[in-house]
Regions:
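HotDog/MaoC-like acyl-thioester-processing domains
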Residues: 74-76, 81, 85-123
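A generic structural signal for short beta-strands and their flanking turns/coil linkers
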Residues: 3-5, 16-18, 37, 60-66, ...
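Hydrophobic beta-strand-centered segment that forms part of the acyl-chain substrate-binding groove
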Residues: 50-81, 86
């Protein structure tokens, strides 16, 4: 999904954070030329999943809750940057806050995601 939508994962700016960017183009915009809300959520959920997997290698991390507020539209041609910060790092739950901004640094979406951390099953 990340390749299909054009996500690019970036180096981590500080501990317990992760960052990615995505150019708004025909892969992730809706018919009016704006970034799709679904693509925005996919960016946030992929980023929080990558963050949880980095914190818990050898575990399975699955999203169990997503809450978002889209506060500003982004037109095709712009690039959005998502920065995820972990709010809670428990044994079985991670709570992430993701802020997505446009190239001017304006807030586009604020997303909160809860990931459930599972042990890998033994076969």
């Amino acid at each position: 999904l990340s390749q299909t939508l054009g996500m690019e994962f970036l180096s981590t700016p500080e501990p317990d954070t992760c960052q990615a960017r995505m150019k708004v183009d025909e892969r992730n915009r809706q018919v009016f030329g704006f970034l799709s809300g679904g693509a925005t959520l996919a960016l946030a959920e992929n980023l929080s999943g990558v963050g949880s997997m980095a914190l818990c290698p050898n575990k399975i991390c699955v999203g169990i809750n997503v809450s978002a507020n889209h506060v500003k539209a982004v037109l095709e041609g712009d690039t959005v940057t998502a920065t995820a910060r972990i709010l809670h790092k428990g044994r079985t739950l991670h709570v992430w806050h993701i802020e997505i901004t446009n190239s001017a640094g304006d807030l586009i979406s604020a997303v909160d995601i809860t990931n459930f951390i599972l042990n890998q099953s033994k076969k």
